[in-house]
Amino acid sequence: MFAIIKTGGKQIKVEAGMEIFIEKLEGELNTEVTFEEVLMVDGKFGSPLVQGAKVTGTIVKQGKGKKIRVVRYHPKKNVNKVYGHRQPYTKVKIEKIEA
């Protein structure tokens, strides 16, 4: 059984036992999280959400992604600025899908 959930502005296909990387969620390690914005469960589409469906998971890790370099450059103006950014993420293990 699989489902498509909406979290962090993205749609993610999940199955029980999967570990997914999503946008940062507030919470400590080993805390249970529930996703109630379920768009599809086992072939049944919602409009826009499936009524009564929810996906439950556990927070496994809080971390930051790889560093990216952002450059601000203006030619002939002697302006050259380099910024760094690391996007925070949460790793969640999907425990069960309820339809």
From Swiss-Prot:
Name under which the protein is recorded: Large ribosomal subunit protein bL21
InterPro entries: bL21-like, bL21-like_sf, Ribosomal_bL21, Ribosomal_bL21_CS
One GO CC term on file: ribonucleoprotein complex
Any single biological process term in GO: translation
Subunit structure of this chain's protein: Part of the 50S ribosomal subunit. Contacts protein L20.
Alphabetical keyword list: Ribonucleoprotein, Ribosomal protein, RNA-binding, rRNA-binding
PANTHER family assigned to the protein according to its UniProt record, in alphabetical order: 50S RIBOSOMAL PROTEIN L21 (PTHR21349), LARGE RIBOSOMAL SUBUNIT PROTEIN BL21M (PTHR21349:SF0)
Lineage top rank: taxon: Bacteria
Keyword Electron transport: no
Protein family (similarity comment): Belongs to the bacterial ribosomal protein bL21 family.
